[in-house]
């Protein structure tokens, strides 16, 4: 991978690399201790404090990359359970693209409700995600399939949900309880959530 040239050593707005991540060792170690021990974590702070960068930094640690599958889903722009299910499905699908084809085939087998929008190019074999939010007829079923798929992975999965407070705005009620049920039911999964106040 090409090394990124950064002219300002005080990067704000996105994660670049360990080299440019300002000394958050305590927070990184605390997060590691919680996640490695299977605890679901809630991070709450005002905006622009670096919560998402901390998660990205944590996900880029060698031991975490070697032992876990990691997913970061920003739900700030969502307004429904269907949009949440769409973003979760898309995040997982896109992370599978570079993996061997058997992972993609397993994804299609488990994710029956998304199968219509996830296709393989007949010539190249490359996967594509051509699904729209409106294609998700039953978001509850899709969420169940997503978490079933993650529970079958050969490594523990960490799904960080950014701007988690957004679910309070959904028309559907008890979304937090539904996600909590998945977090508790699937021992192969950790759901750190990040909220801005």
Residue ranges and their predicted role:
Residues 1-38:
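A short, basic N-terminal segment
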Residues 34, 150-153, 183-186:
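Conserved catalytic network of the ASCE P-loop NTPase/AAA+ motor domain
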Residues 41:
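Conserved beta-strand position immediately N-terminal to the Walker
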Residues 44-49, 53-161, 167-168, 173:
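P-loop NTPase nucleotide-binding core
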Residues 166, 170-171, 181-189:
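Sensor-1/coupling segment of RecA-like P-loop NTPase cores
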Residues 175-178:
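Charged helix-capping and loop-helix junction motifs
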Residues 188-197:
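Single conserved hydrophobic/aromatic residue that forms the stacking wall/gate
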């Amino acid at each position: 991978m090409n090394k990124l040239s950064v002219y300002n050593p005080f990067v704000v707005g996105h994660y670049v690399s360990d080299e440019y991540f300002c000394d958050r060792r305590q927070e990184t170690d605390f997060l590691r201790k919680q996640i490695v021990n299977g605890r679901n974590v809630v991070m709450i702070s005002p905006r622009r404090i670096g919560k998402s960068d901390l998660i990205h930094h944590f996900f880029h640690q060698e031991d975490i990359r070697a032992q876990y599958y990691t997913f970061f889903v920003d739900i700030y722009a969502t307004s429904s359970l269907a949009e949440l299910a769409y973003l979760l499905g898309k995040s997982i699908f896109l992370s599978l693209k570079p993996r061997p084809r058997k992972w993609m085939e397993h994804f299609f087998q488990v994710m029956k409700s998304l199968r219509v929008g996830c296709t393989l190019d007949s010539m190249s074999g490359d996967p594509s995600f051509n699904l729209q939010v409106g294609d998700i007829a039953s978001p509850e079923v899709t969420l169940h399939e997503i978490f079933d798929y993650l529970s079958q992975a050969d490594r523990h999965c960490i799904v960080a949900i950014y701007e988690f407070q957004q679910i309070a705005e959904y028309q559907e009620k008890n979304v937090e309880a539904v996600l909590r049920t998945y977090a508790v039911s699937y021992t192969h999964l950790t759901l750190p959530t990040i909220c801005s106040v």
